[in-house]
């Protein structure tokens, strides 16, 4: 899904798949806007197939630390994946000069473009993407398989920002 690059995009895509997998029903709307945004901590709770599904998205390490402290103190319970600003703020993105970063919220603009693209896509659910279905059936096996995990997960490498 194109929204993977925005903070909360992976969570939103995962919710689309999880809800349909758990209920066996097609979603009336694929937009989970409560988990969108490039700042702070976004928490949401959904009733799915008689279960409460609680999710949170933290933008940046400061917010991740706050969320981890909430878990540590027994105030919240979540599983984690951390991306400061999402992929739209990652080391693989074009770097902007300091004067642009100081005057323009590039992350918000990039996120808006991704959500606009997502709205115009015919296929908006990862589990319905024919290319993904083909990849799993011919190469990776089942979602969550050892091969899929090994090939599709990475580790963080700090990148220097120019400018």
At which residue positions do the language-model features occur?
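Iron-sulfur (Fe-S) cluster-binding modules
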Residues: 1-163
